[in-house]
Amino acid sequence: MHLYFIVFKSKKKDDYKLFTNTIFDKEKDADEFGRKSMKRGYEHKVLDYNSENHNRYWNVN
């Protein structure tokens, strides 16, 4: 079973940040949520919820 989450960034910046702490079980649902939730000037990306991505985006101080 794969799980997914969404990160976002301003089109003017390089770094993605955690968008929401919601976890999705379908990539399609995560992408749709990201598309409908983004403001103009932002882009989103759907990522696998794994230890590498978790450490990179969730454990940011």
Residue map of PLM features:
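Short aromatic-glycine-(Arg/Gly/Cys) micro-motifs in beta-strand/loop hairpins
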Residues: 1-20
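Short, well-ordered helical secondary-structure segments
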Residues: 3, 11-12, 29, 34-36
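Compositionally biased regions
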Residues: 9-11, 21, 38, 51-52
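Conserved aromatic
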Residues: 24-27
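Short, mixed-charge low-complexity intrinsically disordered segments
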Residues: 31, 35-61
